[in-house]
Amino acid sequence: MAGAPPTDVEECTLETARRELGSYAVPVDRTDRIPLSVAVGRVPATDTTANNRIPGADIGVDDTVFERGHQLRPADVGLLKAAGVSELLVRQRPQVAIVPTGDGVVEYDAGPEERVETAGFTLAQYADRWGGKVTYRNAVADDAPALRMAVQRDLTRDIVVLTGTEPGDTLRAVVRELGDTVTDRVAISPGRETGLAVVQNRPVLLLPESPVAARVGAVQLLRPLLKGFGDAPFSAHPTREATLDGALDTDRAVRSFVPVALDGETATPLSGTDLATATRADGWVTVPDGEANPGAGDTVSVEDWDYLP
């Protein structure tokens, strides 16, 4: 990125963050030829044409069944089988490295002054579901040489995601030395400490350690980035209407995402930024910046962030 690097107090909107990251999301040109039996969720690299006529479906030989960029569903592969298609040329899934960072972070069996790493591990599962080919790394201690090696190691991937970081820490300084920092903060809550950088033309997403904040940052930034690299359609999460049984308390200066538990048509706001809060959430309510908080009895739209794709 051109220009002087921003200070750790600079902040960008979510729309700006998406635009900056999206400018690097050139669809991968790597392809695989795969059997139809494992094609669900994949994105054809070329138009898919019929080898056989399908009676009653108005599809003849050499007709286009699905255009390039269509993400295949289970019913789609059934139609392709009827059209005599047995294998497909698909785009390879974009490669994403997820690297947890921080002192005292372990994979299992945390001792005194240690904690089990969960934010990066959870994000790895989401990234896989969103179409990424994930490399999940062991946690890297808060040591500049070790962090530098960790970032450089994964620059062969399309995207690098680092968790456990905040403005002004050792990792942010290392990333600034290696490349260009776009911003140290994004105007979202939770997750305002989310940072963006570019190192050797690779987008780098810097997420907080909090499971809820990391999840918000990943859903809002990593998911659309993966779809861009994969040339896959980016669809909105499904929503349902619900009535709040308690008022929301958010910062009007930023766009807020509030986890809620659903009981029928009633939504109960959940407090906290720990793993249990993220797990108990049945959906999320978005409160745009500048808008008043919805109160008890108000009807809100609840997004299902666990919906596939």
Predicted regions: what they are:
Residues 4, 45, 54, 60, ...:
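C-terminal terminal segments
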